[in-house]
């Protein structure tokens, strides 16, 4: 091996390492300001700090080396700790060897804290390397056919391996799951043979170790048989870990590429997922090999599954690369998993594994091109980063490499200064250094001996103890004395206890030495504060000089000896006066306009006026705004003796008026004024001259004559009334005796005996340049009786103004292909994803639509396949406006129009196109010049829109006519009223003509991008817009080029744009199949807007050539046209904007030619309309924009103005302000899992002020006074979307303090704090604990989990669509249910006789089920039984902040609470049971309702398309005999801002009542107050001393001799105005109310599908400002995924939002806030669950899909029984929300409380809808 100094490469490496060492910057302040007492402390302050040991040196000894030399310290006396980097082993890379190599192999480096060194690292991967392939296969029963296929494809796999490498080995292992409950059926017969012809269950077995003998491999594989287990997830993680660590048993070779193929179709178990708790397996995996002689895993019964971080670390350590071959059923789980492995592959395995060979080949080539380099075993004090100047990184951090070449990488090694506030040199030795293994994916790597320099200064080891130089009172070391206690001074000659020494330091009249600002040392003051205090007695404070605007010395000077020393050009006591008079120069270049003098940078005018500006010039804009109005009253009283100053007040006017015959013209005077005299309605006029400030001797000229209107018109009123009565009489006679008038009058509701349909308007006038679309929605009305259904056929004809146009169009070639537009209404609801092209839902539906429609239109001769299929919604279409409209285009011959129309109408009448369901009564067929269609009026619908195409073409006339005609009513009894609608489209003068430069371009594929110029000829300078799209010819999209479409917008003055089309390389297959054919495609312009017209050519052809055959003619050329003339001034040149901070932008430019008087700057937020721009005037060519938003993009431009007016604006410039630290995060929320485990979540800061990059969570113990105990632990959450953390192993019954702060590019923001003790929180029902999809922190453990995400409980569900579930065929016969509560959770007490996925999860209020399927514990009978429940404690989420965080009115805490759900379960789980469904619910009567949609497949009375909602309530709310029922009504009446009257009705009871109990407390926690009322006749109570604007929960219950009854609960808030300084004190006499007027109305949820719902709400009654829109937040109620936000614009009475992409059976929390001009208002909150159980273990129960809501609070209770009951919600005495009758017999009811809408769908299929009167709380 060559020595490290002999190689030129090593010299280059050392030179690069020396150059890369970070140089000291301007950090002298840091070294100087550090309060260090020794050399060692100084050296550790910063990497650039040095220490002077010169005894004669008198300055500060700790400084940078350069500063010390400059201050006079000798070079040999300066002590500096130098870092070092030395290569200890370096063997040159030999590319002829067929193995992976690195260089260098050994390195030793020592770094100072904060220092970074870099070096070059080389890695070589050969073209062909040895490969070890180990196949690990799932052997559960569902993989039986996969095993059979693997046995048959031996030759193919061997062939592929030989193609990959000549040196390979192959092995095989199998796994199922742990042989324990509940994973495996433990019955003896099932342990012997779980399936026919199968092996006993096992965990993992190494069947065939890695071998070169392929024949032996296949012979052993033939004898393998399948096995089985119970649950769907498998135990593959155990198998992967054993395969990695058992290197000798598996047979991994040292210098080969290790590939592990993991084949399964199921999800996986992982550490602490809860399954092992049931079997008592609690120990963590020890990460060791545990295989016996037969290769079987032996510790499956004693150790848990490994975690994801463990597998990632161990596979990387042993150079093993995983290849996940999984089926579609489990693809989503492994798609998340494989991203955590630096180098891995994921492929979709077919159901029978027939494609495993192809998948393996593809994965091998993908893996070979990626290389990951990681630093293993790195100590905490060192950070390693690997970069490359030539190689690209992937999203997982690996590099794209080329095999056979040496890759060069830059390794950056940095020593950190501190960790969590502790200096690195104070950490343990193992954290300061160690052996770092820099390891590539396929080789051993580089060993680095790295450490942080924490040595003690040598001079401190050589100190003179009790030195004579220190008067024997101290030690001399490092050039100075370190005095003993009680002595000070440079030579320790001053006694700190001697009073006489302080006398020279006492100022006259003071008793403190050095004025209390310093220390007296040997008769001399040494001032504190590092320069803050000065003077002989430290009497001057340099922070107490005069300030201006808060700045010391106006930031224009420095404070010295108590006075400001100003910078040049400034003067004054606080440096606030400029010496220059530049700010006093007027627009003419003079000083103060000659009417004043300049002092301290300001003009002092000789004569002050309201209309003079800062330079004593006349402000004409101010004159125009107020002058006329100021003079009006005086002119009116002096000239005419009228007005408000008539009489004596007129004598006070400061001027006189003069009546003249004629006034001067407006342009000759300052202002021409005109007003109306209120006394006689006449108009008088007068002029104002001069400077606009008439003085005592001034005269105002007034016109002598007034302009008066003609005589009075009051006599016309009786005449008009008479004429109107006569007209009404004539209309009545016409209707009676004239038949022709009946049709017209029939359109009026008052005159119609039947019902009619007709268009609302008869004429529309449109301007083409203002049109935003090529269609028009024309309303059609139905009058009279709205019962029944009517359909109307219509047609529209284009260009009716041209005689014979239709005949000419028909005479063209009948075989020519023309596009026909088709629109149909599908039988499914529309979602937002459907309207977004490219989403999976949209693509799936598009494929389904095109397949079915193509099948139908095959009957049309010459028809092509459908294209341009899109989906949308159409409003105003009756009751089906939420359904999906599909628009598509069909190419067919011109002669096929009639056949196409008849075929479409026939299929629409049938309600289907092949297998595609469509809604009858709606279609549109659009031809070249006409269109036909049909619309439908459903029952009760009065208005629908008819969407007609407008046939916008470039060749249209300047004024063209279209005619819309209602043809007939094929279905229904309506007669046609207004049948015709005329549409006139006026084409304005075009603002520009847009076209291509050339009709054809030739480009080379080697250019990768075709750049096609588009030009505009400006006719009228304004905006122009056109659409563009590519079309295939001989070139095909996605094969030769990437298709594009979009819109081009030309701003004023723009004449040139460029289209870019990405070109694709020609594949060999294409060149062989398609030969040498010239490939071309077209780019087409269309749909001009904003007055644009298409010129010629509007279509261009792009010819693709190869690299050596193209004569490229596509020239990128910027065309520009001179701007139109604007006066004598041009546009300012070279505008430049630069951010000057987070809220400032400096904008400057070069002046244009000419003499501008000033500049006008226009700026606005990018994306806003220019009409919302702000304007600034400037006299100089620069301006500073202030009061901006942080991290916001602004656009700006500037123009000059002069005497001729404004010139043209400059080009647009954009600039982004800097980031500012974010505000504190939103409120902290705690989901208490147990007394030692909590889930912490928080909201994003209200003001992010930039891009949030991370959050820091700190938590630590506090005492009873909330003071910290010990250090706080910090957790960095570097994914800003993940605002959730699971903290485990907290101490029992100990309060913790939690803080969360956010970071953006500007730094860390303030903290949000909360203190909570988990033990004091209420217990909640729990299921098996499943680790959510969030970071997990062990409060007592290390940091193993901090950088990895775990998986949620969805991995435990088997695929719903799987036809072969991997479970046993025995489902058991019953179960045992035991409630599991809080910290009493002990899963070892629980046993199941069913698989976990078949066990229903019941809430605490639902009782438990026995083996027979009936409800136990208080159940009486089958149909009318009741279940006894308990009253839960207040939810813990109201204590989310750990302090009394009172809720404002309308917040989530004031209106919403969580309640238990009503659950319906089947009576048995066997596949052969009856269809009996038993509904259960809690007996606790609450003021909340749950919403559930239920569908039974066996009933047949309701179609599946109906989304109905069922409100399930207690069937019998009565309890035991003699116990009072719940008080039936709870009514609140506000008596004042702090007092409330609570009333209720006497409950039903079989015994005599003894009294009542009223309890109340703050909704978000606090002291519980209780009032006992012994008088049973008293049903009201007055509560005093409530807090204003705070929500209270009240509970009322009655008592009899048998005990207390159930309670009635209600929540109320008294709103009132409070004192600004004391928010708990209401203002005397202020109004008070019980409403929440600034929150949105109640949230109403409607299920659309199992994964989407529709949310609607009403606008706030009294919003704070004008409503701009709403912000809707959707998040999982229990956490697990980042929150989603939606913006809904507009101010509608009722707003709606469709939310797709939800999960079934998962509770979601929705929050709605109104966004107003004053900001965001309070939230309205609701919790909802879409419940769905389709197939799975309950195939006989059909489909159960609906909504479960923890809904809004309201005074409402209902009982559903077989008879009609009345439900009356009350808000206060005498005001009811209305009465609802709920019919329980065969009806499904959707009910929303408070302000509510009730819809009832009966079993017979008829639908009735009514809207109750809506009330708000008052």
Swiss-Prot record:
Share the record's PTM remark. Answer: Palmitoylated by DHHC3 at several cysteines of the membrane-proximal region, enhancing stability and cell surface expression. Palmitoylation also promotes secondary association with tertaspanins.
Binding residues for Ca(2+) 1: 142, 145-146, 351
What is the annotated localization of this protein?
Cell membrane; Cell junction, Hemidesmosome
Segments of this protein annotated with the region Palmitoylated on several cysteines? 734-751
Membrane topology per the record?
A: Single-pass type I membrane protein; Lipid-anchor
Protein's recorded name: Integrin beta-4
Question: Which UniProt keyword terms apply here?
Answer: Calcium, Cell adhesion, Cell junction, Cell membrane, Disulfide bond, EGF-like domain, Glycoprotein, Integrin, Lipoprotein, Magnesium, Membrane, Metal-binding, Palmitate, Phosphoprotein, Receptor, Repeat, Signal, Transmembrane, Transmembrane helix
Annotated GO biological process = autophagy; cell adhesion; cell motility; cell-matrix adhesion; filopodium assembly; hemidesmosome assembly; integrin-mediated signaling pathway; mesodermal cell differentiation
Q: Where is the PSI domain?
A: 30-74
Where is the motif Cell attachment site annotated in this sequence? 473-475, 1005-1007
In the record, Phosphoserine modifications are located at: 773, 1071, 1121, 1451, 1454, 1470, 1490, 1787
Domain Fibronectin type-III: from-to ranges: 1131-1220, 1224-1323, 1526-1621, 1639-1735
All ranges on the Extracellular side of the membrane = 29-712
Entry superkingdom? Eukaryota
Record's keyword annotation contains Lipid biosynthesis: no
Positions with biased composition (Gly residues): 1415-1426
Q: Taxonomic lineage of this organism?
A: Eukaryota, Metazoa, Chordata, Craniata, Vertebrata
This protein's species is: Mus musculus
Q: Listed GO cellular component terms?
A: basal plasma membrane; basement membrane; cell leading edge; cell surface; hemidesmosome; integrin complex; nuclear membrane; nucleolus
Q: How does it assemble?
A: Heterodimer of an alpha and a beta subunit. Beta-4 associates with alpha-6. Interacts (via cytoplasmic region) with COL17A1 (via cytoplasmic region). Interacts (via cytoplasmic region) with DST isoform 3 (via N-terminus). Interacts (via cytoplasmic domain) with DST (via N-terminus). Interacts with RAC1. ITGA6:ITGB4 is found in a ternary complex with NRG1 and ERBB3. ITGA6:ITGB4 is found in a ternary complex with IGF1 and IGF1R. ITGA6:ITGB4 interacts with IGF2. Interacts with TMEM268; this interaction prevents ITGB4 degradation.
Q: What is known of its domains?
A: The fibronectin type-III-like domains bind BPAG1 and plectin and probably also recruit BP230.
Name the family: Belongs to the integrin beta chain family.
Positions where Phosphothreonine occurs in the chain: 1483, 1526
Whichever gene encodes this chain, its name is Itgb4
Q: Where does Mg(2+) bind?
A: 140, 142, 234
Residue ranges of domain I-EGF in the record: 459-493, 494-539, 540-576, 577-617
